[in-house]
Amino acid sequence: MAELHPRTGKLISLSNGNRTAARKQPAQEFNQGLVVSARPLGPGEVFTVRLDRKMNSWSGSMEIGLTTQDPAFLDFPSSATGLKGGSWIVSGCSVLEDGRSVLEEYGQDLDQLGEGDRVGVQRSISGELHLWVNGRDCGAASCGIPPRVWAVVDLYGKCTQITVLSCQPPPEEEEEEDAEEQEGSLVPLGQSRPDKFPNSLDTDSGFPSTELSAVVSNAILSAYHGSLLSVSLGSPPAAIEHSPPTCNDALLFHEKCGTLIKLSNGNKTAERRRPLDEFNNGVVMTNRPLRDCEMFEIRIDKLVDKWSGSIEIGVTTHNPNSLEYPATMTNLRSGTIMMSGCGILTNGKGTRREYCEFSLDELQEGDHIGLTRKSSGALHFYINGMDQGVASCQTPPVVYGVVDLYGMAVKVTIVHNHNHADRLRRNNAILRARSPDTGRHSSSTPEPGQLLFHSNCGQKASIINGGRTALRPHATDDFNHGVVLSNRPLQNNEVFQVRIDKMVDKWAGSIEIGVTTHNPAYLQLPSTMTNLRSGTWMMTGNGVMHNGTTILDEYGHNLDRLKAGDTVGVVRREDGTLNFFVNGIAQGVAAWNVPPNVFAVVDLYGQAAQATIMDESDALPLPGDEDEGLALTPGTPCALLSLSDLRFHHLHGANALITNGGRTVLRKNSRSEFNDAIVMSSRPLRDGEMFEIVIQKMVDRWSGSIEAGVTAIRPEDLEFPNTMTDIDYDTWMLSGTAIMQDGNTLRNNYGCDLDSLGAGSRIGMMKTIRGDLHYFINGEDQGVACTGLPMGRDIYAVIDLYGQCVQVSLTGGSGLVDNSLSASHVTDKSLPSQSPVPSVSHRFHTVCGKNVSVLCDGTRAERGAGCSHGIVFSSRELLTNETFEIRVEKIEPHWSGSCNIGVTSLSPHEVSLLGGGLPERALELRSKVTWLVCGSEVTRNGQRLRENYCNSLERVRVGSRLGVRRDSDDTLHILMNGEDMGPAACGIPKAVYAVLDIHGCITALSTVSSSLLEEPDATKPPSITSESEEEEDPADHGDPHTVIQAHSLQFLANHGKNILLSHGNRTATRVSSYNQGIVVLPQPLPRLFLFQIRIDQLSPHWTSSLSIGVIAVSPERLNFPATAAALKRSSWIFQRSAVLCNGVKIREGYGPNLDLCPEGTCLGLLLDSSGGLHLYVNGLDQGVGAQDLPEVCYVLVDLYGQCEQVSIVTGEAQGAELDAHEGQLPGEREKADMVDGVKESLCWVPPDPVALLSCEYLALCTRFKDLLLLPDGYFLEDSKLCVCHCDSCHKLRGDETYRKRGDPPREYAEPIGWCSFPLRLSPRSSCAQYKKWHIAYQGSSAGTIRRTLDRGDLLPGSACILTSVPAKSDPQSGFPAAEPNVLPPRDLQSVVLSPTLRYAALPEMCPKVMFRDPRSQRMFGAQVALQVCVRPGSYKTGPPSACAIDLMDPRIPSSEMEFLTKEKGATVLRGLLVRVE
């Protein structure tokens, strides 16, 4: 009897004698459902399972295949596609080998199976993988399968339960019976499952189907608009009956198409020509009729904004070969069904006006549209993979797919079922991310009750806010009797933390906190807890008391100095130690041998009037939360990390969707709905409390944007209107620049304009104690908006996600500005806290070693006592190519050893399931696979894999950075101070966490990297293109300044946050990080005026460098993004060797690469009279980079990456002419070295400093030269004499492409694309001897270059690539040795040279060799050649003999392409040339 192996995925439960497998929590989890056969399959055996149960809330379904991995030793991945080391999986209708797709469109689409269907997998006797569906063989899916394999089934997505039926060879006559059944009347395969994708998504929990459907569809649609995922439905198998006689050709566009259509990409892509001039004549059809149930799906690649209307798609019975294509398909009056907008047109007439809720006119680039004709004749359309239902019930059997590229639609591509599994996983990830309550608690064990205050409290204390807040209502009348205890005992390692809400300035002393063994239900509470004489430990002031007696005098932070907004906490560790925290910072061990089951206690004594319990959701976001507003930089003071308990109220407008635990709100259907998205705060605002949100997403479809304000109406009493300005009572709103009360405008031109704010901007509202309403933009007070808010009434914050604003999140606010209960006095305890700065950083998980304290919102980890128990994890799984990087913050040198870093497949949530918790060292993590770098070794589960992998980690110091990354090829990489140490291990699964062991001398770490999912593109590290959004309305400009004083030029005081101005604002320095370094000029750039800056300082710690350009918006109102590339409106930027317009690259290969400019380089900008923008490099005009610029433009410089300081030099050197005379231009040399006006250095004079660049190509060529193991004695010692002739360096020096040299002068080509390494001249020769010789090149090879250098000359008969007669040499002199008594050979072969490398470097004469770069570990191809001096008159010229004429150099005559010489001493080696591809 066939059975399943008892070892399974972690969410699988087995029953029925290990024959039935079910996925636990199927509504919350869609993976972790792997099962494997109990034994290897025998020859020809079919392992058959039945699909018992499905759940339609996920995408994807069962996956099945074979694996060579023994389940007894297998580390089960989250899904079958994660199996490595010999696995073959059928997913959907794709076949994957070790996770990589090897076959598309195979057999039956497993995603379309229904309950009761049978699926089998077989390894045939010949080693082929066969899939069987309902007893029918789908054919060979793969070959070369080893004989010992196990069957594997993944209960993924919709599939929640299966049962094993059998494991035996198929009957011999089964194939014949199948053939007979196909000819007869066979019941269709899909009879047991619905023909239509279910529109209802009802769940067992009673969630309304319409609401859930809307949530899911909008979430997926939003994800598509954000290009987060793309889902392509697999093609179901062709129906057996009634299918038209079609061929098996791939589905492509027909060659005959509309008059303006251009086909490309193998007829898979269609594009309309002249899209800005014509809007129709863009009809394309498929090359063959569609099969039944075949998906015809296209992706929108390009849209234009000029026209109304957009793409139309459908089917037609007309054969494209005989059809005369109309201007639009809606003109056809027969045999045509088209979807246009959101309706259906049949033969040009509307048959269904509202077919679906999505309009084709609203789709964006990257969206998918598909259609399929079912075997029943029903026509279905799909938008981004979602079935829109039946569009037509009686579709003819033979139809062609047709697309009309009309109006805005310009370019589409047919897409097939590529990356099927990845699309489904991204789809499911979006589904779960958009349902915040789904899958948060995967453990089946119930959590302990919420930690609250007990109702039994001190005589003068009261418990409010559902047990979370304790206060002394009459704090100015009495200073004690304010003791409150927790409602249950603390668990081990459970932190009890409270925030001080209110204080009074009347008394001395303040809050006290601690633990007690007394149960609050039976305790007669004293006036202060220090009066208890048993079972009590309290922190008071800056001391610790036990049973009323002081045991520590000077301990930690003085609690009497705390102010409102500060936090204090206490925790009992497993080892019985007691630790206190102040503002999240551990104060160290306060007591030992504290018994378990102690209650937390807070004494609201003296000045402390109110405190609130801070739960985990207040301090740390849940794993996977993507709330940019809650992320804080590692440098943020811990005192600022006490986030507010404010949330969005659960009652809201119809189009609002609350996610992220009430901290994020988004508007559904953002491109079809612009209002009905009002949200309110979850509770009333306190006086002086700021309610602050950050804008996270905007669309450019609507006019108007976010509106914000306050109301005295309770959410329960409000019938939410379309917009909040419709309310005519008790409401105050800011809309644009207008302040409105009860729907009427109070004042215009308020200090800020909400319509001009873009993504990343923060908006705050605060009601003062006097009843004034203030607004804050990015933390800056905009002044009083209105006065007279009602005193004594509850005031709620209101946000209206209107128009362009789609999504916002809470930042946590700024706390209370005035918390004093005395209205006439303001003390230092009521000073406002600063607003947290929105930023996105990686975090450590709260689950950690028992000696570790995770602080500062999870961005810092410190080890307390001892040298072990210091394991910490990343807060979530690492994404592919995501770097988790930390910085060493503290070292204690009296310990030996250092930290370890790596990855583990052990989830922090599973630590509680380990017996005894986390071990002392990360090397002992063996329950799941763990890879670590310890010292310089790489280990796997404690077993050594590699030695001497990198520099020893024991050498790290304070400030050192360590990073870990899992690459897309499943390799583990370690980074030290930003440098990749190369692959450390391979075969790393997807679901891994970063793990570190804070061991030995390392005692504190902090995260310095950022999340790939959460991070805005504009803040990514250098060398990554930034594409973040920048929303900025153009401002009114004054008249341009036609005359400008050069000496008065200075940078504007409004600049990037990392910029420091000096020297009269003429010098800008970036003082930290690699971005946020934008500076601008306050004056517009006049026409024909050359503005210049000089690069003063570069840092080798970063990649990439400065950008320079102009903007057409007023710099006074510019919200500076992180990089210049993030400016999306009215900007023209020179970056690297490209030109960007509004963040989009419009030109490549312009001028030199700015990333390679050294210190001292002068860069300039000039606007010509016709509006053309010119870039100047060291006074050299690089030509027009952009045209038709507006009249008013402001200069912008971005100090990015390597560039740390620039200075304005326009006042020091007026114009390009003066600048050219101040310093020698690149390539400039003495007049005596000039021949026919072309400059040339003859004796290896050191090149211009501009050429001495840190060029990556030169470094790569140098590494290859080192691999040749050539003696250093052959080369000049000074490495600065090596010259790179790559395109960037060549342009930067201003070198000519061709030069003339010798007497008489002869032209030769520069070695562009090569690197030159100068060779030593023979001691017998002089430099001046060869000044009048000509220059030529000879191709060589990596295997013969050493012999040529040993000989020292290209003699006739030397062992070069073009000659074959051997010759002897004298190794001592390095020159040929004459052979006594031997006559020279009569027939010497000529040495063949050429004045151009286009000929000398042909593969026949200069073969390419492959090598692995020791630094990047990538494979490259390399060529070597020699540059030689040739004596005039010693050679003959001739036509090429090695290739056709059309491959020659256009400047070198073909009759002079070869130099042939047989004379001894006619050539001298000048340099070794290397080219790498």
Curated annotation (Swiss-Prot):
The record's annotation in PROSITE patterns points to: NHR
> What SMART domains would the database entry show?
NEUZ
Chief location of this protein within or outside the cell: cytoplasm
Recount the PTM note: Ubiquitinated. This ubiquitination leads to proteasomal degradation.
Q: Which InterPro entries match?
A: B30.2/SPRY_sf, ConA-like_dom_sf, Neuralized, NHR_dom
Q: Give the UniProt entry's GO cellular component terms.
A: centriole; cytoplasm
Residue ranges of the NHR domain?
A: 1-167, 250-417, 450-616, 645-813, 841-1010, 1048-1211
Q: Which SUPFAM superfamilies match?
A: Concanavalin A-like lectins/glucanases
What keywords does the record list, in alphabetical order?
Answer: Cytoplasm, Cytoskeleton, Repeat, Ubl conjugation, Ubl conjugation pathway
> Which compartments does it reside in?
Cytoplasm, Cytoskeleton, Microtubule organizing center, Centrosome, Centriole
Superkingdom of the source? Answer: Eukaryota
Task: Spell out the residue ranges making up region: Disordered.
Answer: 1-26, 168-196, 1012-1041
- Bias (Acidic residues): 171-183
Job description of the protein:
Promotes CCP110 ubiquitination and proteasome-dependent degradation. By counteracting accumulation of CP110, maintains normal centriolar homeostasis and preventing formation of ectopic microtubular organizing centers.
PANTHER family assigned: NEURALIZED, NEURALIZED-LIKE PROTEIN 4
Output this protein's name. Neuralized-like protein 4
Please name the source species.
Xenopus tropicalis (Western clawed frog)
Gene behind this chain? neurl4
